[in-house]
């Protein structure tokens, strides 16, 4: 069974980039960044010292380098520096600070708000810094800040080890981690940040520091959920766990007519599920999955996506109730490589489409929420739009809310309203649908929000994202970045 081929027939036309007015940036700074052309002498000096590439508008690689995952983002930086070493990052940070330039940091370029790129300023592109070193005996991995989830999984699964990551393998490790990070392994092993042992950071002053539980402990605390507010992380060290390499995983697809009953049974099932079992629910139009009859392609569906890390035979027994919530339209469940399951949804989330998200956390799932979900699923504005519930809980709830910057330890489910479409003419309709359902579901939410799911127009929710830890984060920001150099993020103002 090969999940990497689940969506092999999914044909999602992505045209040449075409941009309307972009969503408003929510960047704030105590000084106005310069937008004039930089003197040639300063650029020459930077290029002479820089080991990687320095790209300017008009260079052959510039257009491709400024584009990121979300095609709604259309920004034109004054220069893009593709770093190859930590020394390159130091040079770039100092150059931005000394010249008053707006600074954006690009890891995987997957941020929904488009913070990986900026207008007029400088983009520090880490995508060439992705080397990994695994110590299987110590169960540790060191990986550079430009790596993707696929890079990290490939390195660790060679030793049948893994750390909790997200579910789209093209996502950058850095952005995922700095916002908290959760995925299929999180119920058993916690958030990504709960497995972070140390980080090498280039600060706003251009210093290189190692942050861990004993060195720069305040910075280490802030990095674990405080987004990109405190510096450029050039290397991460993660704790690893025995995982796979082959695990039970797959999809069970039901018709949308059964959605409320399936969601109710899903809620009760997850309340008793062991930490080793992760099940997410997604509602959308059925893509042309090879295991679904052609007659149901494009019709409404609710899917249960699952992974079990234990013995597959026991896992089959545990998931048997999931197969009986109603009459499935199709199933694709079996033992397969963990890395294949990590990449199973990549084609549905390929770069080049237009994306807009709205998200809530939930400590419980109420029937009233299910009614709202069904109402808005019947109004899907495009075949790619969807609503999903990521079940976390388990190990993610056990640390104290102030153990790290990420504070939402009461969240058992993260819901994302994913507007996704191709034609710019559909912008208003798709964004409006996401916003309207977000409002309809708000009465049932627990109040927090996962910072990595905030769109560019949600500056009013930043304090909700950081929760009770905001004031402490602002103090750490004052210590490490008093002038708010790192502000292309869900920004925390220095106290």
For the regions a language model picked out, list residue spans one by one.
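Soluble FAD-dependent oxygen oxidases
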Residues: 6-11, 21-495
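Short linear/disordered segments characteristic of secreted peptide precursors
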Residues: 13-15
């Amino acid at each position: 069974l090969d999940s990497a081929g689940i969506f092999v027939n999914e044909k999602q036309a992505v045209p040449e980039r075409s941009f309307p007015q972009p969503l408003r940036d929510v960047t704030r700074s105590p000084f106005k960044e310069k937008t004039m052309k930089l003197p040639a002498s300063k650029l020459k000096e930077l290029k002479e010292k820089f080991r990687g590439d320095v790209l300017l508008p008009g260079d052959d690689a510039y257009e491709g380098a400024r584009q990121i995952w979300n095609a709604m983002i259309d920004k034109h930086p004054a220069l893009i520096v593709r770093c190859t070493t930590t020394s390159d990052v130091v040079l770039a940070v100092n150059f931005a600070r000394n010249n008053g330039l707006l600074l954006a940091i690009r890891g995987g370029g997957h941020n929904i708000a488009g913070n990986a790129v900026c207008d007029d300023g400088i983009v520090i592109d880490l995508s060439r810094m992705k080397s990994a070193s695994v110590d299987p005996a110590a169960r540790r991995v060191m990986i550079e800040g430009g790596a993707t989830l696929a890079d990290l999984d490939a390195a660790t699964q060679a030793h049948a080890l893994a750390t909790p990551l997200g579910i789209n393998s093209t996502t950058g490790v850095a952005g995922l981690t700095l916002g908290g990070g959760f995925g299929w392994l999180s119920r058993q092993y916690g958030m990504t940040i709960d497995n972070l042992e140390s980080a090498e950071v280039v600060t706003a002053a251009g210093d290189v520091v190692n942050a861990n539980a004993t060195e720069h402990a305040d910075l280490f605390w802030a990095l674990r959920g405080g987004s990109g507010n405190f510096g450029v992380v050039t290397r991460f060290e993660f704790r690893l766990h025995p995982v796979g390499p082959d695990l039970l995983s797959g999809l069970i697809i039901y018709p949308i007519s059964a959605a409320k009953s399936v969601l109710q049974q899903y809620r009760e099932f997850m309340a008793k599920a062991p930490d080793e079992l992760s099940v997410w629910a997604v509602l959308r139009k059925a893509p042309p999955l090879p295991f679904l009859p052609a007659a149901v392609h494009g019709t409404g569906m609710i899917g249960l996506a699952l992974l079990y890390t234990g013995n597959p035979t026991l896992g089959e027994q545990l998931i048997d109730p999931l197969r009986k919530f109603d009459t499935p339209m199709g199933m694709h469940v079996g033992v397969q490589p963990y890395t294949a399951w990590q990449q199973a949804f990549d084609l549905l989330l390929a770069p080049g489409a237009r994306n807009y998200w709205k998200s809530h956390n939930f400590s419980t799932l109420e029937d009233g929420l299910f009614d709202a979900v069904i109402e808005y699923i019947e109004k899907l504005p495009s075949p790619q739009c969807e609503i999903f519930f990521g079940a976390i809980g388990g190990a993610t709830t056990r640390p104290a809310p102030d153990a790290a910057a990420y504070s939402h330890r009461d969240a058992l489910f993260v819901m994302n309203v994913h507007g996704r479409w191709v034609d710019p003419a559909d912008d208003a309709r798709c964004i409006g649908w996401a916003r309207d359902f977000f409002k309809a579901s708000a009465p049932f939410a627990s109040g927090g929000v996962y910072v990595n799911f905030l769109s560019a127009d949600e500056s009013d929710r930043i304090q909700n994202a950081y929760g009770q830890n905001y004031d402490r984060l602002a103090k750490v920001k004052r210590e490490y970045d008093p002038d708010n150099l790192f502000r292309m993020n869900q920004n925390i103002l220095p106290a």
